[in-house]
Amino acid sequence: MARYKTAPWASPKVCAMTTPVLQILIASTRPGRVGPSVAAWIHERALAHGGFTVELIDLAEVNLPMFDEPNHPRLREYTHQHTKDWSATISRADAFIFVIPEYNYGFNAAIKNAIDYLNHEWKYKPVGFVSYGGVAAGTRAAQMLKQVVTTLKMHPLFETVSIPFVQQFLDADRRLQPNEIMETSATAMLDELVRTSGALQVLRAPAAGLTA
C-alpha cells in the first residue's frame, strides 16, 4: 500500500489557529472627508463580529509622501523610515477592509500610492471593500481597485458594502446610521474575510513553516 507524506499545509505550525488581524484602511485624506465616519461604523461591526483583532489605519495620519523609494518594492530594499514603518504595519495584517470614496469614476490617489509602496506585504491576503459616493455608491472605484490588488496576489472578495448618496446616512454628529442592507452586507463580508483569511494562511506562511 502506498504511503503518503503529510501535506505541507497539515503542519502544526501552519494549521495553528490564531485570531487574524484585520486592518481597516481609510483611503480618503482630504479635509471634510466622509471616510472616518464610514470607517468608524465598519470598525464597530468588525469588533462586534469577534473574528478578528481589528486595527483602524487612517492614511491621512500615515501621511506617506508620493512614492519616493529608489528601488522596486519587490526587493524590499527600503531606504526611507516611512516606508519601513509602513511595511511593518501592513506585514501585521492577515486581511483588510479598504474604505474608499469614488473620484471621477475611479479610486483616489492616496490609496493607490499606499499600495504601490509595497509588494510582498500584500500577498495572499483577502480584502473587502466598503465604498461610498453618489448614485454609483463608489462601486466603480472598487471595481478598478480590484484590478490593482489582484496584481499583488491579494484576494478581493465578492462580498462588498456599497453606500449610495452617503450623506443621507450621516446624522447631526456625522455618525453613520446604516440601513438593513448595509448591515447585512457588512456581516457577509466579515464572515467571508474570516473564511478566506484562514484558507490563505498556508500561502502566507514562511517557507520554514512548510518544511518543518
Q: Which sequence ranges carry the predicted segments?
A:
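Mobile beta-alpha loop/short-helix "lid" or hinge segments that flank ligand
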Residues: 55-66, 120, 152-173
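N-terminal beta1-alpha1-beta2 submodule of the flavodoxin-like/Rossmannoid cofactor-binding fold
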Residues: 5, 9-100, 105-113, 176-187, ...
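A generic structural signal for secondary-structure junctions
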Residues: 71-72, 119, 150-153, 198
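Rossmann-fold NAD(P) dinucleotide-binding segment
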Residues: 108-124
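A short small-residue
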Residues: 18-24, 124-126, 164-173
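Alpha-helical structural signal in soluble globular domains
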Residues: 41-49, 117, 121, 148-151
